[in-house]
Amino acid sequence: MASTNFRPLHDRVVVRRVESEAKTKGGIIIPDTAKEKPQEGEIVAVGSGARDESGKVVALDVKAGDRILFGKWSGTEVKIDGEDLLIMKEADIMGIIG
């Protein structure tokens, strides 16, 4: 798992995309070339937090295991231990699911 081999710094998080369904509710199969990348993911690892104006570290609102929604163009795609992941700032996260 990426969290043991990579620790993001400051207010960054490592996210694993949650794959979308390959078939629509009506039964139409969507080929990989037509699929959009999912904007939902699971947090794998979190940084220690950002510093406020006084220099105090402010912890993140998210934690490893949270399911999140993020912007379409959020994050930087990386490959860690052979797994495709995203690294993004906490500000790129729109919300926590559940």
From Swiss-Prot:
<dbReference type="InterPro" id="IPR018369">
    <property type="entry name" value="Chaprnonin_Cpn10_CS"/>
</dbReference>
<dbReference type="GO" id="GO:0051082">
    <property type="term" value="F:unfolded protein binding"/>
</dbReference>
<dbReference type="InterPro" id="IPR037124">
    <property type="entry name" value="Chaperonin_GroES_sf"/>
</dbReference>
<dbReference type="GO" id="GO:0046872">
    <property type="term" value="F:metal ion binding"/>
</dbReference>
<dbReference type="InterPro" id="IPR020818">
    <property type="entry name" value="Chaperonin_GroES"/>
</dbReference>
<dbReference type="GO" id="GO:0005737">
    <property type="term" value="C:cytoplasm"/>
</dbReference>
<keyword id="KW-0143">Chaperone</keyword>
<dbReference type="GO" id="GO:0044183">
    <property type="term" value="F:protein folding chaperone"/>
</dbReference>
<protein>
    <recommendedName>
        <fullName>Co-chaperonin GroES</fullName>
    </recommendedName>
</protein>
<dbReference type="Pfam" id="PF00166">
    <property type="entry name" value="Cpn10"/>
</dbReference>
<dbReference type="GO" id="GO:0005524">
    <property type="term" value="F:ATP binding"/>
</dbReference>
<keyword id="KW-0963">Cytoplasm</keyword>
<comment type="function">
    <text>Together with the chaperonin GroEL, plays an essential role in assisting protein folding. The GroEL-GroES system forms a nano-cage that allows encapsulation of the non-native substrate proteins and provides a physical environment optimized to promote and accelerate protein folding. GroES binds to the apical surface of the GroEL ring, thereby capping the opening of the GroEL channel.</text>
</comment>
<dbReference type="GO" id="GO:0051085">
    <property type="term" value="P:chaperone cofactor-dependent protein refolding"/>
</dbReference>
<dbReference type="InterPro" id="IPR011032">
    <property type="entry name" value="GroES-like_sf"/>
</dbReference>
<comment type="subunit">
    <text>Heptamer of 7 subunits arranged in a ring. Interacts with the chaperonin GroEL.</text>
</comment>
<comment type="similarity">
    <text>Belongs to the GroES chaperonin family.</text>
</comment>
<dbReference type="GO" id="GO:0051087">
    <property type="term" value="F:protein-folding chaperone binding"/>
</dbReference>
